[in-house]
From Swiss-Prot:
CDD domains: DHQS. It catalyses: 7-phospho-2-dehydro-3-deoxy-D-arabino-heptonate = 3-dehydroquinate + phosphate. It is found in: Cytoplasm. Binds 1 divalent metal cation per subunit. Can use either Co(2+) or Zn(2+). Its EC number is 4.2.3.4. Pathway: Metabolic intermediate biosynthesis; chorismate biosynthesis; chorismate from D-erythrose 4-phosphate and phosphoenolpyruvate: step 2/7. GO terms for cellular component: cytoplasm. InterPro entries: Dehydroquinate_synthase (IPR050071), DHQ_synth_AroB (IPR016037), DHQ_synth_fam (IPR030963), DHQS/DOIS_N (IPR030960), DHQS_C (IPR056179). GO terms for molecular function: 3-dehydroquinate synthase activity; metal ion binding; nucleotide binding. This is 3-dehydroquinate synthase. The lineage of its organism: Bacteria, Bacillati, Bacillota, Bacilli, Bacillales.
Length: 363
């Protein structure tokens, strides 16, 4: 098992990673001061059916534990479910000493975290991720819900008390969720750990390799990349934006195709390839785009759909949170491990995206 210490300006906490991590949950709760009055577990239907009782049983405490379960899927990260969770919290008499446990993937972590951030102006919460993708979202304190006009547009910065990454929970994931989460692992390697990138190319030949000790190794290498960036810039005023590598186009694809019709990781994978494609043009460097594309395709990541309107995608990219006064800002790569936020004119993005779309179709 590997423990990772997270330090930000507002809070310090630990991430417990391993096959026995759930055993720490009771101690985490018992050590909280002031003492926890009661616990609300927020989960989704798919995860709750598999793991909710396991977590309840692991909480060997006297306090009342109850659950709030929403349907599964990114579209459920909505104001309606956010409001309903508050109603449930009030009905079950949560107070300022209560604790919320986010049991699920990134959608649940975002939803439950924002409920915790806003209920009575902020109460404590613990992340219990059940997906590989959540190795990214569970750490760092960004919590949010979606708006019909944009992803993660309503939210806050609210750090958890701890993250309990019980790796056996991941074994029930379908392949598309392994692939989705692995995209964020690749992202962390490309922007902050070149040694990890080379290790992935050698050791992860198929998604089936993301198991057991290799999985724990990946998590204990990828999470510190994010932790180091968050320690420098907790509220995304500077270098934390580097974590959005691949996300400008990725989020646009999610919005255009409809949340749930493409996984977050698949969108980010296409977005990273486009960022590398554009970076080669902007910086006049060779980043081995063609080799990278074949590596991504080996894992089953999609190509950019040929029937999507480039003009519409550019419009959606202008709504990205990094955009400033309607100008697209993208995270581009100078070399592996070195990225920057760059202002890109609409016309440049449009021309590059058309060429990228054509390249993905023809090759």
């Amino acid at each position: 098992m590997g423990n990772i210490h997270i330090q930000t300006k507002s809070k310090e906490y630990d991430v417990y990673v391993g096959k026995e991590s759930l055993s720490h949950l009771t101690t985490i709760v018992q050590n909280m001061q002031p003492a926890v009055s009661n616990i609300m577990i927020i989960s989704d239907e798919a995860v709750a059916s598999l793991h909710l009782q396991t977590v309840v049983d692991a909480l060997q405490i006297d306090q009342k534990v109850f659950s709030f379960v929403v349907p599964s899927g990114e579209k459920e990260k909505s104001f309606e479910n956010f409001y309903a969770a508050h109603t449930s919290a009030l009905e079950n008499k949560l107070d300022r000493n209560s604790l919320i446990v986010a049991l699920g993937g990134g959608m649940i972590g975002d939803l439950a975290g924002f409920v915790a951030a806003s209920f009575m102006r902020g109460i404590r919460f613990v992340q219990v991720p059940t997906t590989l993708l959540a190795h990214d979202s569970a750490v760092g304190g960004k919590v949010a819900i979606n708006h019909p006009l944009g992803k993660n547009m309503i939210g806050a910065f609210h750090q958890p008390e701890a993250v309990v990454y019980h790796t056996p929970f991941l074994q029930s994931l379908p392949e598309k969720e392994w692939r989705s989460g692995y995209a964020e692992v690749i992202k962390h390697a490309l922007i902050g750990d070149v040694k990890l990138y080379h290790w992935l190319k050698e050791e992860v030949q198929t998604l089936a390799d993301l198991r057991d000790e290799k999985l724990i190794h990946i998590l204990t290498k990828a999470i510190p990349v994010k932790a180091n960036i968050v320690a420098q810039d907790e509220t995304e005023k500077g270098v934390r934006a580097h974590l959005n590598f691949g996300h400008t186009l990725g989020h646009a694809l999610e919005k255009e195709l409809g949340y749930g019709n493409i996984t977050h990781g698949d969108g980010v994978a296409v977005g990273m390839l486009f960022a590398i494609f554009l970076s080669e043009q902007v910086y006049k460097v060779n980043l081995a785009y063609e080799e990278m594309k074949q590596w991504f395709l080996k894992y089953g990541y999609p190509k950019m759909p040929s029937d999507l309107s480039v003009e519409r995608l550019v419009g959606l990219m202008k709504q990205d949170k990094k955009a400033n006064a309607g100008t697209i800002h993208m995270v581009l790569m100078q070399e592996y491990g070195v990225v920057n936020v760059v202002s890109i004119p609409d016309e440049t993005v449009h021309i590059a995206l058309e060429a990228f779309q054509k390249d993905m179709v023809e090759k």
